[in-house]
Each structure stands twice: as structure tokens, then as C-alpha cells.
Amino acid sequence: LAGRYSGVGIWLRAGIGGGSEISSLKKGSVAKRAGLKVGDVIILVDNVDLSSASVNEVAAALRGKAGAVLKLSVLRKGVEKK
């Protein structure tokens, strides 16, 4: 695959209740600037339901060409945030 690919600056782990939970945020990352927080569970990426996807599947959905825009929805303390 040719081109530059990038992530959003998060580390994931399997969530206790399922899904993929943010375990760490890179300082100064796009994710941190967008307001994501440790403990958020990623449930949608670009309107694709990832609530029961593996950590690897969620990580793959978050990777893309540098500068690409992603729309995320997360669960934060049981409340959906977009």
C-alpha cells in the first residue's frame, strides 16, 4: 500500500463490558484535541458499528491516510458521545 498512513494517537484495550476501550492517549494527539478520554469505548467509526469488534478491527478502522477525517461515537460512562 503506497502512501502515508497515520493513527489518531490512542491505545486500545478490550473493554470490560465488550468493545474497545481507550487505555491511553498520546500527548498532543488529534484524539486528545478532539476530546476523547481514557475509558471511552469506541462504538462507531464513520457510521460503522464497531461495538462488538475486536481491538484489532477497531485499530484498523482508525488507521487511514494522514489528514483524513473520521467521525467517531464513543460511550463515556454509559452515555453516547459523538
Regions found by a protein language model. Give the residues of each.
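Conserved PDZ fold ligand-binding element
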Residues: 31-54
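Short glycine-rich loop/turn motifs that provide flexible caps or phosphate-binding loops at active sites
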Residues: 6-8, 34, 66
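Generic hydrophobic, aliphatic-rich segments that mediate packing or membrane embedding
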Residues: 4-6, 38, 54, 58
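Solvent-exposed coil/turn segments that connect beta secondary-structure elements
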Residues: 13-17, 25-28, 47-48, 65-67, ...
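PDZ-domain C-terminal substructure recognizer with occasional recognition of PDZ-binding tails
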Residues: 21, 43, 57-82
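Short beta-strands and strand-coil junctions in structured, solvent-facing domains, enriched
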Residues: 20, 30-32, 51, 80-81
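PDZ/PDZ-like peptide-tail recognition elements
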Residues: 1-24
